Amino acid sequence: MADSDKDELAEIAGFGYERARDELVNVVKMLEQGGMDLDESLALWERGEALANRCEEHLAGARKRVEDALAGSESDES
């Protein structure tokens, strides 16, 4: 993996959910428009995959927080 790829992944790892989602939407739009050569398209697709993974991480964390809160509520009621 090239240093620029590592830098990009490190940058994406710091994104909040909304920023990652918004950038992912833009990546999808650009890919749908076409007009890029194969290398550009692949690089953009790889960025989209990293952004999608970041969104999934945020959603998994949110899901866990909700489950934990619900479990705490249920134990308080017992």
Swiss-Prot record:
Q: Cite the entry's keywords alphabetically.
A: Cytoplasm, Exonuclease, Hydrolase, Nuclease
Q: Which reaction does it catalyse?
A: Exonucleolytic cleavage in either 5'- to 3'- or 3'- to 5'-direction to yield nucleoside 5'-phosphates
Report whether Flavoprotein shows up as a keyword of the record.
no
Recorded GO MF terms: exodeoxyribonuclease VII activity
* One Gene Ontology cellular component: exodeoxyribonuclease VII complex
Origin: domain of life: Bacteria
Main location as per UniProt: cytoplasm
Q: Which GO terms describe its biological process?
A: DNA catabolic process
Q: What biological function has been recorded for the protein in this entry?
A: Bidirectionally degrades single-stranded DNA into large acid-insoluble oligonucleotides, which are then degraded further into small acid-soluble oligonucleotides.
In the record, the note on similarity to other proteins reads: Belongs to the XseB family.
HAMAP family named in the record: Exonuc_7_S (MF_00337)
Please describe the quaternary structure of this protein: Heterooligomer composed of large and small subunits.
- This protein is called Exodeoxyribonuclease 7 small subunit
Organism expressing this protein natively: Nocardia farcinica (strain IFM 10152)
Gene behind this chain? xseB
